[in-house]
């Protein structure tokens, strides 16, 4: 864990004008970037640097796959992020090329974008918290992928099934944001018999955290005295949502498995298995999300 240091404000390049000053390497790079931006603006070149120098810290962290931008904000506010040895508490702090950025003391490197589909086994946690003693998704996948990735959304510890993994924060934001409404399908194993009448009632939805959640689809796959199997598709993403909706109708879930995310099915992926997404799968998933939100 990075020790919290007193937050320092940036000094203007060139110092205060009182006495001789020495530029740090970062000040030199900032000055060069500013000069380049000003030059680009004068000659009419459309350049990102002509408007701002560097990249916002929260955006930079998300782009490197640390987590979604919202989660990166939380890490910054929590004092987990340092730049060049100084803890930064402002998500809008500008990161320059060559800056040493660390999260919990671990240096974050710029790398290529990674996208994977993973089958999370039951009992595994969707967290990167190093203080956690239970098995985490990252403990299983880190040896199998060429860079750091995070889970796109969550599955609770007792659930199993499909998870997307990436180091692309923008992709993660698109897939998880409620306005995009990516459909996810679950198979739920109930520990008692239920009827088609029970299913009809549950199709009306239930209030979860003050918001009414209505399944996109809900069907009874089988039912007997020993138990029942239900398939539910939703486009929300609240904590333990499927279990909570069914519980409103006295359906007690003993096992839950996510079998589909958008256009991606479980197919031949075994528990603990992982595979990269194809470019077409990734592009189709993003297009599906944007279409659902009306951005297409």
Residues covered by each model-derived region:
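Charged, low-complexity terminal tails
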Residues: 1-37
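Basic, flexible Lys/Arg- and Gly-enriched helix-loop patches that mediate nucleic-acid binding at interfaces
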Residues: 25, 32-296
């Amino acid at each position: 864990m990075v020790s919290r240091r007193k937050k320092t404000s940036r000094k203007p390049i060139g110092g205060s004008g009182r006495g001789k000053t020495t530029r740090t390497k970062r000040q030199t790079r900032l000055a060069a970037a500013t000069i380049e931006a000003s030059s680009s603006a004068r000659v009419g070149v459309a350049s990102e640097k002509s408007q701002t120098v560097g990249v916002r810290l929260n955006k930079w962290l998300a782009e490197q796959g640390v987590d979604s931008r919202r989660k990166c904000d939380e890490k910054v506010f929590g004092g987990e992020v340092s730049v060049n040895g100084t803890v930064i508490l402002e998500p809008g702090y500008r990161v320059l090329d060559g800056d040493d950025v660390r999260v919990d003391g671990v240096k974050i490197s710029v790398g290529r974008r990674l996208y994977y589909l993973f089958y999370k086994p039951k009992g595994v946690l969707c967290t990167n918290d190093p203080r956690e003693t239970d098995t985490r998704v990252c403990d299983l996948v880190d040896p199998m992928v060429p860079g750091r990735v995070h889970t796109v959304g969550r599955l609770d510890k007792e659930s199993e099934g499909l998870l997307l993994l990436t180091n692309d924060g923008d992709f993660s934001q698109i897939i998880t944001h409620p306005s995009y409404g990516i459909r996810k399908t679950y198979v739920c194993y109930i520990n008692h018999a239920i009827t088609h009448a029970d299913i009809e009632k549950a199709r009306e939805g239930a209030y979860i955290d003050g918001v009414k959640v209505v399944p996109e689809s809900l069907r009874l796959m089988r039912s007997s005295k020993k138990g029942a199997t239900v398939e539910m598709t939703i486009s929300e993403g609240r904590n333990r949502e499927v279990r909570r909706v069914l519980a409103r109708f006295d359906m007690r879930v003993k096992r839950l498995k996510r079998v589909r995310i958008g256009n991606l099915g479980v197919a031949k992926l075994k528990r603990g298995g992982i595979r990269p997404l194809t470019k077409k799968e990734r592009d189709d998933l993003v297009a599906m999300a944007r279409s659902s939100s009306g951005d297409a």
